[in-house]
Amino acid sequence: MIGKHCILELCECNSVKLDDEAFIRTTIQMASKVAGAQLLNLITHKFVPQGVTGLALLAESHISIHTWPESGYAAVDVFTCGDQTMPDKACQLLVEELQSKRHSLKTLRRDTPVMISNALIN
Amino acid sequence: MIGKHCILELCECNSVKLDDEAFIRTTIQMASKVAGAQLLNLITHKFVPQGVTGLALLAESHISIHTWPESGYAAVDVFTCGDQTMPDKACQLLVEELQSKRHSLKTLRRDTPVMISNALIN
């Protein structure tokens, strides 16, 4: 398996935090750390009138967060490669830090087409 | 629906192109354009001894590419929001530009948990 890709939908989050670019940056840094990943670069963008996007380039792939404060919603991806990383821990941290009261987590294995016939493992 | 997330596995690609950071940058810029998306920021990283990661921050979400030249493989995500973008066109361009002879494309809808019970639409 090349990697594990967690697709996380966070609902009923704290809207103030979802719209706080500095908070999103710090939270992505924390998420990288608890996942056991190496953060190589991090870019964020604050949209007008609301919303933040954060993209973390990891040695082991990436974390992305897109927020819709007006809906209390964030779309998160945590994609990590290798056996040493724990993307589930990053997801759990994001649920807690963004104070999501309702979430959905799906995990895909990323691999060559021959290997992904059973791509949805959770 | 918040957005459409294309998960693309590219196999049997041109390994030289997969390892060419400048080529990956240019290709992501082209992919953003054909998708009808607005590219706000683009970061890339060249790994040693091989491999490139590219992350594009779009006004409409993101594009990510992670390459394994030694396997001829690239893991691609094209996540766009709104009705005006065409992530499928970006995927088709990436298949062609990276000269993938075999690929797999899955499309997820991204939305709040209530709405994603039928998340896999393709």
From Swiss-Prot, chains A, B:
Q: Which GO terms describe its biological process?
A: spermidine biosynthetic process
Keywords in alphabetical order: Autocatalytic cleavage, Decarboxylase, Lyase, Polyamine biosynthesis, Pyruvate, S-adenosyl-L-methionine, Schiff base, Spermidine biosynthesis, Zymogen
Name the SUPFAM superfamilies on file.
Answer: S-adenosylmethionine decarboxylase (SSF56276)
Q: Catalytic activity annotated for this protein?
A: S-adenosyl-L-methionine + H(+) = S-adenosyl 3-(methylsulfanyl)propylamine + CO2
Q: Where in the chain is the site Cleavage (non-hydrolytic)?
A: E60, S61
Cofactor(s) needed, names only, are: pyruvate
Write down the EC number: 4.1.1.50
PTM note: Is synthesized initially as an inactive proenzyme. Formation of the active enzyme involves a self-maturation process in which the active site pyruvoyl group is generated from an internal serine residue via an autocatalytic post-translational modification. Two non-identical subunits are generated from the proenzyme in this reaction, and the pyruvate is formed at the N-terminus of the alpha chain, which is derived from the carboxyl end of the proenzyme.
Question: What gene is this protein a product of?
Answer: speH
**Pathway assigned to this chain's UniProt record:** Amine and polyamine biosynthesis; S-adenosylmethioninamine biosynthesis; S-adenosylmethioninamine from S-adenosyl-L-methionine: step 1/1
EC main class here is: lyase
Protein family (similarity comment) = Belongs to the prokaryotic AdoMetDC family. Type 1 subfamily.
Q: One GO CC term of this entry?
A: cytosol
* NCBIfam families tied to this protein: SAM_DCase_Bsu
Q: Which domain of life is it from?
A: Bacteria
Cofactor binding description: Binds 1 pyruvoyl group covalently per subunit.
Functional summary from the UniProt entry:
Catalyzes the decarboxylation of S-adenosylmethionine to S-adenosylmethioninamine (dcAdoMet), the propylamine donor required for the synthesis of the polyamines spermine and spermidine from the diamine putrescine.
Entry protein name? S-adenosylmethionine decarboxylase proenzyme
